[in-house]
């Protein structure tokens, strides 16, 4: 079963403050609060937010390549064939004489002939059957086509059939959090977070007694925001260039390992808080009683999560109307080649006001590589048991 699911590590660097709001106003330190883990109270980027915006960016990536090559949906219906997939195949065959539609490229997956911008976001016509590809709502907007790589990879729901999708997103949790200190900016983390991300070195135990660990271990004391803590020793963490985002590289000497019990307190005390005010368009001055504050995950924060791709091509009994399914390689390419949109268009709220941009790094999980090597036959003994 493990061979059917491919996992990828996700490391994300916030290049702008990131605001994923909880909705509405609250009474407290700030008016607009951000999403937090209900157990640890540490801010995070929910997997639902990541999946939704990545779906949109995948659509943008595909349309940028096929916009002038894809047919109208009415042209597909004119093709011979009983099912929609047969009509698509016949249209592609008519185009392949000039190499217009190369299905080996993920941009030109068979079902992408029906892809529209509305395949991202909420379906406008969920009450229609999958075969009704020209259906529109009262505003004339189409819905999820149910045939393209995006619909099959991220999921869709129609009157006659629903599909879970093949890509599964975890939350992005904070791994390294930047804090100002007397020694400059340092990034705090915990042993538990290093374990979950696969970065924990051997010999590093949990810190206790409100002491922290640094690379040098000779600082005596260090301030993390308003907290003044004793340095209890050294850590042996070696990133070996694992946390690199183009020109940015996190160094071992920049990392401070703190007790799990203090991590939430330090993070929540050092979030970015931005004060905004509404402007009267007539006077050009601030409106009275229109001041509000918003908190955000600060620039420089590094987050960690994972994405699993579930290969359902080997399933028997999949309805014919769902075929063909994209393979894992095509879905992985789609994610990797569309993630650059996060660097320009961002994620979350207030992206037009200096928020939201992140850099994403995708890589295969180390344990999967080990498992692949473990399953390879041993050439020294003919592949038998040792």
Question: What spans do the regions from the language model cover?
Answer:
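RNA-binding basic/glycine-rich loop and surface signature characteristic of RAMP-family CRISPR effectors
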Residues: 1-386
């Amino acid at each position: 079963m493990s061979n059917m699911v491919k996992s990828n590590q996700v490391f994300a660097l916030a290049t702008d403050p990131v605001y994923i709001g909880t909705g509405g106003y609250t009474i407290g330190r700030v008016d607009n609060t951000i999403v937090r883990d209900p157990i640890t109270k540490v801010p995070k980027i929910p997997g639902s937010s990541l999946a939704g915006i990545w779906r949109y960016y995948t659509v943008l990536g595909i349309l940028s390549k096929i916009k002038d090559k894809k047919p109208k949906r009415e042209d597909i219906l004119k093709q011979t064939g009983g099912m929609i997939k047969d009509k698509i195949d016949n249209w592609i065959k008519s185009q392949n004489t000039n190499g217009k539609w190369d299905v080996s490229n993920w941009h030109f997956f068979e079902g992408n002939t029906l892809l529209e911008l509305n395949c991202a976001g909420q379906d406008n016509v969920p009450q229609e059957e999958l075969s009704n590809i020209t259906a529109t709502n009262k505003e004339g907007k189409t819905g999820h086509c149910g045939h393209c790589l995006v619909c099959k990879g991220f999921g869709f729901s129609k009157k006659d059939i629903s599909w879970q999708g093949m890509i599964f997103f975890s939350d992005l949790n904070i791994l390294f959090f930047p804090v100002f200190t007397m020694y400059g900016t340092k990034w705090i983390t915990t042993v538990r977070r290093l374990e979950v991300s696969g970065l924990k070195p051997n010999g590093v135990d949990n810190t206790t007694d409100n002491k922290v660990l640094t690379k040098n271990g000779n600082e005596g004391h260090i301030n993390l925001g308003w907290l003044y803590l004793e340095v209890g020793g050294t850590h042996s963490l070696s990133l070996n260039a694992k946390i690199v985002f183009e020109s940015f590289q996190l160094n071992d000497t920049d990392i401070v390992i703190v007790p799990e019990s203090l991590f939430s307190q330090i993070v929540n005390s050092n979030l970015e808080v931005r004060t905004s005010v509404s402007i009267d368009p007539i006077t050009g001055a601030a409106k009275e009683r229109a001041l509000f504050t918003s908190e955000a995950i600060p620039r420089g924060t590094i987050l960690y999560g994972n994405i699993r791709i579930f290969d359902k091509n080997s399933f028997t009994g999949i309805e014919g109307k769902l075929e063909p399914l994209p393979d894992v390689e095509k879905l992985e390419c789609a994610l990797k080649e569309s993630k650059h949109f996060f660097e320009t268009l961002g994620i979350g709220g207030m992206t037009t006001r200096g928020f939201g941009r992140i850099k994403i790094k995708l890589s295969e999980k180390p344990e999967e590589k080990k498992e692949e090597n473990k399953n390879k036959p041993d050439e020294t003994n003919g592949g038998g048991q040792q």
